[in-house]
Design a protein with these regions (language model features):
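A short helix->loop->beta-strand "cap" motif at the edges of active sites that frequently abuts
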Residues: 57-58, 102-104, 129-131, 248
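Predominantly a Rossmann-like dinucleotide-binding segment in NAD(P)-dependent oxidoreductases
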Residues: 132, 139-232, 286, 377
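N-terminal Rossmann-like dinucleotide-binding module
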Residues: 1-55
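C-terminal helix-rich "cap/oligomerization" subdomain common to oxidoreductases
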Residues: 1-4, 333-385
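C-terminal glycine/acidic-rich active-site capping loop/insertion
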Residues: 212, 239, 244, 273-354
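Hydrophobic residues in well-ordered beta-strands that form the structural core
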Residues: 108, 133-135, 278
Length: 385
């Protein structure tokens, strides 16, 4: 196969936020082209979106079930190779399940499902079908996050003792859903978002970042979950104490009522030799701190970075790289892995470095454990899956 991968999309219609981000990211490296979509539960909106994206109307579908049924009848090379699912949380599992069962590989926006049970079922289907699966935890795509991961993997800062990860936003400080704002309305609705609000929306990103960078797994939690805004049905703020499988302790907080904050996700990790710090709002910089010497400043695009980080840099040092490029790294790695798989060849080094179903299951377990802990009077709870 010497061609671009054909991508279909479920969700991401006009006025949606994340669908356009996925399309731009998928397009950045030239390995993927959008060929079809079921962009909305409203057939007219789906059709209008297809027109805006210059798609043939015969490849714009009223439902995702129609799309999967029709696309699999087309010859390989013309039909979609994989589908990107960018719907609200309650519409993740069924499209992903049906796509896999119809022979399509899947890229899925997080969280992986509506419940932990659904996530486990999805894993069974992936294993049964042998199809490829990517979960878009965006922040693992940043080059300096990967540099932090490599520094820890090589034991440069020693045995990990403390992990702090935070994700403050401020956009839900007021009762925005009461005004009918689209993003706020579904994200604060238990029927569409699930049992968690902020902890499901951004807490899962912080949790995934902590486990990805450190290479550790959370084993115990103690959560304090709060709803600050009157009338809101789900949590908008929370703090979680963490215990890791090497004995390290940590803290995670995720809030969407920190007035004035934007998307300030940040991680600090401390070992017995040194520590490191990265934050998305200065994404090209990684601080490495030492017990007995000055702080070192690592910059994206520099020649001294690890091979893993360098593979995920796109521009020379000093040229900003950000959210879209991090997203694109996930799509690029998935695409090159899938092309190699389809050609029965070996994928380029580092291309397997993207989140999958295991990260999805742990993310859903995080949500369910945190909400259970927040409702409990117990000091600590085991992190159960």
């Amino acid at each position: 196969m010497n061609r671009k991968l054909n991508m279909g999309m479920v969700g991401g219609g006009k006025d949606a936020f994340i669908g356009a981000v996925h399309r731009m990211a998928a397009n950045l490296d030239g390995h993927i082209q959008l060929v079809c979509g079921a962009f909305s539960s409203n057939p007219t909106k789906s059709s209008d979106t297809g027109k805006e994206l210059y798609l043939a109307q015969s490849r714009v579908y009223a439902t995702y079930t129609d799309m999967f049924a029709q696309e699999k009848l087309l010859p390989i090379g013309e039909r979609m190779d994989f589908v990107s699912i960018v719907t609200p949380n309650h519409l993740h599992f069924e499209p992903a399940k049906l796509a896999l069962e119809n022979g399509f590989d899947v890229v899925l926006d997080k969280p992986v499902a509506f419940t932990l049970a659904e996530a486990k079922t999805l894993k069974e289907i992936i294993n049964k079908t042998g199809k490829s699966f990517c979960l878009t935890h965006t922040y693992t795509g940043y080059p300096m996050v990967k540099e932090a991961k490599e520094i820890i993997r090589e034991n440069k800062i020693g045995t990990i003792k403390k992990v702090y990860v935070s994700y403050p936003q401020g956009w839900l400080t007021t009762f925005l859903e009461g005004d009918g704002q689209k993003q706020a309305t579904w994200r604060t609705d238990p029927a569409k978002s699930g049992i968690a609000g902020s902890m499901g929306d951004i807490g899962t990103h912080a949790f995934n970042l902590a486990e990805y960078v450190t290479g550790l797994q959370v084993t115990k939690i103690c959560a304090d979950i709060t709803t600050n805004v009157a009338g809101r049905k789900l949590d908008d703020d929370g703090t979680v104490l963490l215990k890791f499988n090497n004995g390290a302790s940590g803290m995670l907080y995720a809030t969407q009522v920190a007035a004035g904050e934007e998307n300030n996700i940040r991680i600090q990790v401390y070992g017995d030799k040194g520590g490191l710090e990265w934050k998305q709002e200065d994404a090209n910089t990684l601080l490495v701190k030492w017990l007995d010497k000055p702080v070192e400043i690592y910059r994206a695009g520099s020649s001294y970075l690890s091979p893993l980080a360098s593979f995920n840099c796109r521009t020379p040092a000093g040229h900003p790289e950000g959210y879209l490029e991090a997203f694109a790294n996930l799509y690029r790695n998935f695409a090159l892995s899938l092309i190699a798989k389809n050609n029965s060849t070996e994928a380029p080094e580092f291309c397997s470095d993207y989140p999958g179903i295991e990260e999805g299951i742990r993310g859903m377990a995080f949500i369910e454990n945190v909400i259970a802990s927040g409702k409990s009077n117990d000091k600590w709870m085991d992190f159960s899956i």
